Amino acid sequence: MKSFIHHEYVSIGHHNSTHRIILLHGWGADSDDLLPIGKSIIHNLSHEFEIVSLKAPDFRANGVGRQWYSLFPPDWNEAKISVGKLIDTLKWFDTQKIPLRDTVLLGFSQGAAMALDAGLRLDLGLVVSCSGYPHPEWIPSENCPVLLSHGLQDDIVPPSASREILKKLKHKKYLNVGSHEFNCAHTIHENFIDVIRIKIEEIF
């Protein structure tokens, strides 16, 4: 039975795309935020990629930007519901033409937490967490390749959050995990884009 899509999204691609990258923006941003990153990642890859950037469902309390769930204070029950809806949406994108195993899921900050929680329950080609953190009681299950990145000067989400993710993945004996730290703040370092591109070519 076909899953239901719960999210609006922006799509950039061609009818002959064979692979897909799905982007999950951070707290207070919108679906357009990561599009430049997505374009840089797929530029001149050996496979034709479609970019899909999902829009978080809720507006922040002040009406500026969107959120996957409330963070101030954090509503972890709302997060669980949001993860469930994201899983449905990701399954909706699991098509015969572009299955999830030919899909990269990339999230930034709150979007990274969502990508890890939802993505590691599915048979994805690659999950990428940028400046992410683990949800409470998160236990990774599906053993797909994972890339982690974090800025050492990040004062929004501390680097220790990604180190905790790595610890949990190693505890579950994940075989294909890469962790990278950069001399930057709460952002996606330009050098990490090259790391992602190399990993995509290696996997696909």
Predicted features by range, described:
Residues 148-150, 154:
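Short beta-strand/loop motif that positions the catalytic acidic residue
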Residues 163-166, 172-204:
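C-terminal catalytic histidine-bearing segment of alpha/beta-hydrolase fold enzymes
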Residues 2-98:
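Serine-hydrolase catalytic machinery in alpha/beta-hydrolase-like enzymes
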Residues 106-111, 115:
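Gly/Ala-rich beta-loop-alpha elbow adjacent to hydrolase catalytic centers
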Residues 36, 117-121:
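Active-site signature of alpha/beta-hydrolase-fold catalytic machinery across serine-
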Residues 97-107:
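Alpha/beta-hydrolase fold nucleophile elbow
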Residues 123-134:
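A conserved short beta-strand
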Residues 36-39, 158-168:
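Short alpha-helix in the alpha/beta-hydrolase fold that links the catalytic acid
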